[in-house]
Amino acid sequence: MIIDWNYNRIGEKRPDVKNFILEKKYKTIDIGASAMYWSYPECKYVADSVVISNEGTTFFKLNLEDKSTWSELLSYVETNGKFDFSICSHTLEDVFNPLDLIGLLTKISNSGFIAIPSKYDEFLFLYGQPYRGNAHHKQFFDMVNDKLTIFPKFSWIENDERSNEILKYDKGRELSFYWENEIPVEIFGVGKPFMSDGDLMNEYYKQLVK
């Protein structure tokens, strides 16, 4: 289940997470940490594509978008048991199938912390660019009824005035949460028929403008 989710400043929760795993003495793995290994030295296990060689760190080289490369990590967990805790920070938004990565997190750890850019961040015009959010992000996320919901980055968000309405409620550029045992997740619109583009767009903004 999802515990203690918040909108916050980017990186605001990192000291709390480091203190948490230190106090609990949790065996922790950071998934996707190569770009920014902020969980070190409290976290001594990393899985990603770019090798990290920090002292005392055990590294699993894999491609988060290719399940055939996960065998070393999964074999380790099968032999040694699940990690107490996992960290996945600013990674889910980068992969084409976040459901696979979420499944990996629950397969290798009993609990964890996830941080992702918030919807407010993804609807901003960042760094002087003429488009909203980050071009390399495949989707964005929000909490709907305490469930992590994946939203497609439809092209029409660039010009629809309701995109600006979302920003009036800005509560922070990062969405973060702790979880235990499982991560409730769904994809916006799956299993729900829409009669028209207008219906789709109206439901999209109904869930996001707040």
Language model features with spans:
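Conserved SAM-binding loop
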Residues: 24-124
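Class I SAM-dependent methyltransferase Rossmann-like catalytic core
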Residues: 1-23
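A short acidic, often aromatic-flanked loop/helix-cap motif at beta-alpha or helix-coil junctions
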Residues: 10-11, 52-54, 66-69, 146-149, ...
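S-adenosyl-L-methionine-dependent methyltransferase catalytic module, highlighting the catalytic core
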Residues: 99-210
